[in-house]
A protein has these predicted regions:
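ASCE RecA-like P-loop NTPase motor cores
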Residues: 1-405, 419
Length: 419
C-alpha cells in the first residue's frame, strides 16, 4: 500500500474563523469524538477548512454530498488542494435508470432498463482501487455510496499480483483474468485483455492504460505499460497488482456454494407458490431463476446478479450489504456535506427500495433473498461510522443532537461529542 501523506498545495492560508475551526475539529478527532458539526454558509471556505483538517489527521476520507453536481464540484476542489494524493469521484453510473418493477393493479411488469456512463464506471473503479491501495485518499461520493457494491474481501482476494521473474502458466493466467470478469478480445477497451503468443495485454477498468505482460520459458520476463489512446510507452515495472474488472466478483468455491443455496431457495419458493395455488408465479420464478443459474455457471455472471448478492457475498438474511464504506480501513473519516439535505436522503433510501421489491417477490419475479440487494438502513450506516463531521449552514435535528451543536450567527462554530 502506498504510504504517501496528505499535503495541501495552496497559495492561501486559513483566515478569519478558519484557523479556530481547523484547530477545534482536529482536536476533536484526535480526542476520539465521533460526531462533530462545522457550521458555515456556502462560500465560507468549508472545503478548504476540511482539507486542512484532513491534512492534520492523515485519515482516508469519504465525503458524501447530496447530489452528483455538488460531488463533482467538491472533488475538483479537493484535487486542487491535494494534487499528489488520490481524490476520486464515486456516484451512480447510470445516465438512465428504470428499475425493475411490477404494478399489480394493471398486471404490468417493467423490466429494468439502464444506460451506464462508461467514464463514471471507470471513476468508480478508480475509487475502489485507490481506497484499497493507499492511505492518502479522499473519495467524494453521492448518497448512492450506501448501495451494495460487492465484497471488498473477495475484490482484494481475487486480484492478481504479478512480478518479474515469477513462474507463470500462460493458460492459468488467462483463466484467472476470465474469473476476474475480464473479457478476452482482439480489440482492447476497459476490462478487456488480449493474448498473442507469449504476450498478454490487459486494460484495467480504472485507467486508460494497458499493462503488457511478456512471458518467456514460463516466467514473467517483462512488465510494461503504455497509454491506450496515444500508444506512448509509460515505462517498465517490477511488479503490478491487477484488480477485478467488476465489483461483484466471487471466488469459485464461494460461487458454487452460492449457486447451491440459490437452487435450494428456488425449490422452496416454487413449493410455496404451488401450495398456495399460485401456479403462474411458480412457473415464472422457476424459469427466470434457472436462466440466471445457467448463466452464472457458464460465465460467473448474469444480468441482475446483484439480486443474489446475499449468497454471493456470504451474508446472513437481513445482514447489511457491503458498500463503498466497507472498502475503507477501520480508522477513516466521513464528511457529510450539506448534512441538512444529505442525512434525510441517507435515512429514506431503504424504505422506497423495500416497497418496490415486495411486489416483485410476491408475484414471482424475484426470490425473497432479493430483499437483501438494497441500500444500507440508516441504523446500519451509523454503525459503520468511525468518526464523522457534518457540514451545513443549517444543521438538522439529527446533527444537532448527535454533536451537541447549536447554530451560531457567526459561522463556523464547531461542537462535538464522543457518541
Amino acid at each position: 500500500m502506498f504510504d504517501n501523506k496528505f499535503k495541501i498545495s495552496s497559495k492561501f492560508k486559513p483566515d478569519g474563523d478558519q484557523p479556530r475551526a481547523i484547530k477545534q475539529l482536529t482536536a476533536g478527532l484526535k480526542a476520539g469524538q465521533k460526531f462533530q458539526t462545522l457550521l458555515g454558509v456556502t462560500g465560507s471556505g468549508k472545503t478548504f477548512t476540511m482539507a486542512n483538517v484532513i491534512e492534520n489527521v492523515q485519515k482516508p476520507t469519504l465525503v458524501i454530498a447530496p447530489n452528483k453536481t455538488l460531488a463533482a464540484q467538491l472533488a475538483q476542489e479537493f484535487r486542487t488542494f491535494f494534487p499528489k494524493s488520490a481524490v476520486e469521484y464515486f456516484v451512480s453510473y447510470y445516465d438512465y435508470y428504470q428499475p425493475e418493477a411490477y404494478i399489480s393493479s394493471t398486471d404490468t411488469y417493467i423490466e429494468k432498463e439502464s444506460q451506464i456512463n462508461d467514464e463514471i464506471d471507470r471513476l468508480r473503479h478508480a475509487a475502489t482501487v485507490a481506497v484499497m491501495s493507499r492511505q492518502d485518499v479522499v473519495i467524494v461520493a453521492s448518497v448512492s455510496c450506501i448501495y451494495g457494491l460487492g465484497s471488498p474481501e473477495f475484490y482484494e482476494e481475487i486480484s492478481l499480483s504479478l512480478k518479474i521473474g515469477e513462474a507463470v502458466d500462460r493458460e492459468k493466467l488467462i483463466k484467472d483474468l476470465t474469473e476476474m470478469h475480464f473479457l478476452r478480445s482482439e480489440y482492447l477497451s476497459r476490462g478487456k485483455f488480449r493474448a498473442h503468443g507469449e504476450t498478454i495485454e490487459i486494460m484495467s477498468p480504472s485507467r486508460e492504460i494497458v499493462t503488457r505482460i511478456e512471458i518467456k520459458e514460463d516466467k514473467i520476463k517483462k512488465i510494461s505499460e503504455y497509454n491506450f489512446l496515444t500508444g506512448e510507452a509509460l515505462g517498465n515495472l517490477e511488479k503490478v497488482l491487477i484488480y477485478p474488472a467488476k465489483h461483484f466478483v466471487v471466488p469459485e468455491p464461494v460461487l458454487e456454494e452460492a449457486l447451491n443455496q440459490i437452487e435450494k431457495e428456488l425449490n422452496e419458493r416454487v413449493a410455496y407458490f404451488k401450495k398456495n395455488k399460485k401456479l403462474l408465479e411458480a412457473e415464472r420464478i422457476y424459469r427466470r431463476t434457472k436462466q440466471d443459474l445457467e448463466m452464472m455457471r457458464e460465465i460467473g455472471y448474469c444480468n441482475g446478479i446483484e439480486n443474489y448478492s446475499r449468497y454471493l457475498t456470504g451474508r446472513a438474511p437481513g445482514e447489511a450489504p457491503y458498500t463503498l464504506v466497507d472498502y475503507f480501513s477501520k480508522d477513516f473519516l466521513i464528511v457529510v456535506d450539506e448534512s441538512h439535505v444529505t442525512v434525510p436522503q441517507l435515512n429514506g433510501m431503504y424504505n422506497g427500495d423495500h416497497a418496490r421489491k415486495k411486489a416483485l417477490i410476491d408475484n414471482g419475479f424475484r426470490l425473497p433473498s432479493a430483499y437483501d440487494n438494497r441500500p444500507m438502513k440508516f441504523s446500519e450506516f451509523e454503525k459503520k461510522i468511525n468518526q464523522v463531521i457534518f457540514t451545513s449552514a443549517t444543521p438538522g435535528k439529527y446533527e444537532i443532537e448527535k454533536s451537541s451543536c447549536r447554530p451560531h450567527p457567526n459561522p463556523p462554530l464547531i461542537k462535538g461529542r464522543e457518541a
